[in-house]
Amino acid sequence: MLNVMDKFCWLYEKPTCQGQIKALPEHFIVKENLGFEFAGKGEHFMVKIRKVGENTKYVVNELAKACGVKSRDVSWAGLKDRHAVTEQWISVHLPGKADPDLTDFVAEHPGIEVLETTRHDKKLRPGDLVGNWFQIRLLDLTNPEELALKLEQVKMHGVPNYFGQQRFGHGGNNVIKARSWGNDEFRLRDKSKRSFYLSAARSWLFNMVLSTRIEQGSVNSLMVGDCLQNAGEDNCFLAESITEELQASIDKGLVNITAPLVGDNALPTAADAEAFELAIIANEPSLLKLICDNRMRHERRTLLLKPQEMEWQFDGNDVVLSFALPAGCFATSVVRELLVEQEGSTHANIDQ
């Protein structure tokens, strides 16, 4: 299978170690972190589930039937892959109704467990989560010694905050379609496809900017006019000049350099950084036209991603790796820096 991610640079050089990911669902475990407590009362029935072999939307539809409501009355914070063991909360709008008995629901769906239920005064919405915790078993490693060194590098310095291959579709089809749409080769009314192609377009441009900074050795080095964020904050500020103090803050991870999620408004960068980003974006005029035609607004995303709570344990030629990532970040971008996947490996939809 064509891996469009091969177009983008590795931070620590392309690994020589090969291995397999997710031969079985239990080799890939994902646990959602909402980051807030429930009220314990309210119109919304909250259900924590563990699922294997089922995707989130299927579970939502089946849970709606069990609760006697429409699927539109059931919501979630993030979609989780079917080819994994995943835990997440789902909310069901049940105003004035008692908590339903889910015994039959569980009995009829052997791939779904109900771990916990409670009540809340608000429904879950897509994006209502802090992040996800992952446990991944990487199997049949051909060079465990190299992988051990790369694990230390990743824990210390992080990985490129790339959007993963699943964002771009099989063989990059979502990007190909986005270019054609931007060139007015077809009209598109399907809301789901519009969202896929627009997300792919912005993600592709971000990855191109990030990859070029790695290639030129500037992923950790300030440019005049860079748009920066303090660690853990969303607000940006401009690097009007390069100072030793500011560069030291970047080296320590206290300040992050960002790259664009392109919109129809002007880039917030200036001087060298603005010229650098504009030159790369100009290479994809059809994607830029598509984004502007759809009036998407500019956002920023950090260049580097540092996994939290990162631990690992070798087991022969396998390694069990665990870490936490913020919402919107890809576990596959971490794994990509560690090994080259063997044929037969599968990807999880883990971007939410």
Curated annotation (Swiss-Prot):
Membrane-crossing residue ranges in chain numbering: none
Organism: Photobacterium profundum (strain SS9)
Function as written in the Swiss-Prot or TrEMBL entry: Responsible for synthesis of pseudouridine from uracil-13 in transfer RNAs.
Catalytic site: 81
Keyword ATP-binding included in the entry's annotation: no
Domain of life: Bacteria
Protein name: tRNA pseudouridine synthase D
Broad enzyme group: isomerase
Annotated signal sequence range: none
Family: Belongs to the pseudouridine synthase TruD family.
GO terms of molecular function: RNA binding; tRNA pseudouridine(13) synthase activity
Any one Gene Ontology cellular component term annotated for this protein: cytosol
Catalytic activity from the UniProt record: uridine(13) in tRNA = pseudouridine(13) in tRNA
Every TRUD domain range: 158-306
Keywords: Isomerase, tRNA processing
PROSITE patterns documented for this protein: TRUD, UPF0024
EC number(s) from the headed UniProt entry: 5.4.99.27
